[in-house]
């Protein structure tokens, strides 16, 4: 990981990418990141630095204003510089509770404009502000307890109960994931606007990725629903 400390900063589109912790935006489908020209790579890096420098204060201000619990609002932005990773971004927290937003180099290179980068930052930051990691953990625990309890009550074996608990945890974690993505799209659009970027322009990346549709246990809503959510946020903001 290459942290952006060198920038003087304090411091998740789609086939869904499973993260061990945190939340992520789905991946953009590519056969592999195309090698960038030096000038193209430099332009992408400069655009990313510009976006982070404007989005970070907007993100942290929104976090401080909206938080209902004593969560950490000192965001850290990092870049995963490992070669060969597909375009992706995600939000997680470190051992102290500090929020971290990570980006792969390929996502930075794939973004067509600063609005797309800004919207991704706003979306991922919103997952932390809205408490989605804790809510995901709670939902997973609830699903595990309920399904495991049902199997236990019916006389299931220890192995069967453990399997049911694992299945229940996965079901619980996915149950509200689409709603959480839409919530993050809405607040992310507001944060993007507050930083001076255009979230509707930024959300156009949805038009370039496979549509996850409306699968019952899917982790992401349809692209049309997400673009409509961004448009709704912009209309409400105005």
Roles of regions detected by a PLM:
Residues 8-11:
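C-terminal motif of bacterial Sec signal peptides marking the signal peptidase cleavage site
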Residues 13-142, 194-195, 215-217:
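Peri-catalytic and regulatory segments of divalent metal-dependent proteins
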Residues 132-163, 203-206:
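Post-HEXXH active-site segment of zinc metalloproteases
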Residues 155-201:
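Metalloprotease/metallohydrolase-associated module, dominated by Zn2+-dependent proteases
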Residues 1-2:
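Bacterial N-terminal signal peptides that target proteins for export
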Residues 177, 195-238:
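Long, well-structured alpha-helical subdomains associated
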Residues 123-124, 184, 222:
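DG-centered beta-turn motif at the end of beta-strands
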């Amino acid at each position: 990981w290459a942290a952006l400390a060198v920038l003087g900063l304090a411091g998740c589109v789609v086939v869904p990418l499973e993260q061990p912790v945190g939340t992520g935006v789905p991946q953009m489908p590519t056969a592999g990141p195309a090698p960038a020209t030096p000038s193209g790579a430099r332009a992408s890096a400069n655009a990313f630095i510009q976006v982070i420098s404007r989005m970070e204060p907007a993100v942290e201000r929104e976090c401080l204003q909206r938080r209902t619990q004593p969560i950490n609002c000192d965001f850290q932005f990092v870049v995963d510089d490992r070669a060969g990773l597909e375009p992706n971004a995600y939000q997680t927290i470190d051992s102290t509770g500090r929020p971290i937003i990570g980006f792969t180099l390929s996502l930075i290179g794939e973004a067509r404009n600063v609005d797309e980068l800004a919207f991704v930052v706003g979306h991922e930051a919103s997952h932390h502000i809205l408490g989605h990691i804790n809510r995901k953990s709670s939902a997973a625990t609830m699903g595990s307890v309920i399904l495991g309890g049902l199997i236990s009550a019916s006389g299931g074996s220890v192995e069967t109960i453990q399997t049911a608990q694992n299945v229940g945890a996965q079901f619980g974690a996915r149950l509200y994931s689409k709603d959480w993505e839409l919530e993050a799209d809405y607040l992310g659009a507001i944060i993007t606007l507050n930083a001076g970027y255009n979230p509707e322009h930024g959300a156009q990346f949805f038009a370039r990725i496979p549509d996850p549709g409306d699968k019952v246990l899917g982790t992401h809503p349809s692209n049309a629903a997400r673009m409509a959510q961004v448009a709704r946020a912009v209309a409400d903001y105005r």
